[in-house]
């Protein structure tokens, strides 16, 4: 199999003060996840997001994400705990969707995002981040050179 040419991840962060919830959705190409965790893009032995997922697969994924990804809301780093995981597409285009959700009683005044996912593997990796805080929407492109960005509201 040939690797997909697009070295990209997508992250969407949403905070609605009415619901008092901060939601993070992260979409990663499954081939890249396998490359990062078992060093073989075509090896699907972990079965992430599938009925036959191996017991330690989610832990391995979280260990990796904790090294390359974080969100700080109002200066406090959020502990990564996967609320839901889904697999969409197939073959080289299969994407793993992760959702994280956090109650947030206080108004969001700043969000700091680090998304260096897969920059350890691919020099041309780009990580697109969309941030929606109530009616304020912004988009960022994070990469190996610029892995962190802070937004102030």
PLM region descriptions:
Residues 3-153:
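N-terminal soluble domains immediately following signal/targeting peptides that reside
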């Amino acid at each position: 199999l040939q690797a997909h040419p697009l070295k990209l991840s997508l992250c969407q962060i949403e905070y609605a003060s009415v619901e008092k919830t901060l939601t993070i959705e992260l979409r990663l190409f499954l081939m890249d996840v396998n490359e990062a965790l078992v060093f073989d893009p075509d090896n699907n032995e972990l079965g992430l997001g599938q009925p036959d997922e191996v017991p330690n697969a989610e832990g391995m994924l979280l260990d990796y994400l904790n090294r390359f990804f974080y969100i700080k809301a109002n200066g406090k780093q959020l502990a990564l705990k996967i609320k839901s995981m889904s697999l969409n597409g197939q073959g080289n285009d299969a994407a793993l969707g992760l959702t994280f959700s956090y109650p947030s009683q206080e108004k969001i005044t700043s969000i700091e995002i680090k998304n260096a996912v897969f920059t350890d593997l691919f020099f041309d990796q780009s990580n697109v981040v969309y941030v929606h805080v109530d009616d304020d929407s912004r988009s960022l492109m994070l990469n190996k050179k610029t892995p962190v960005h802070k937004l102030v509201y």
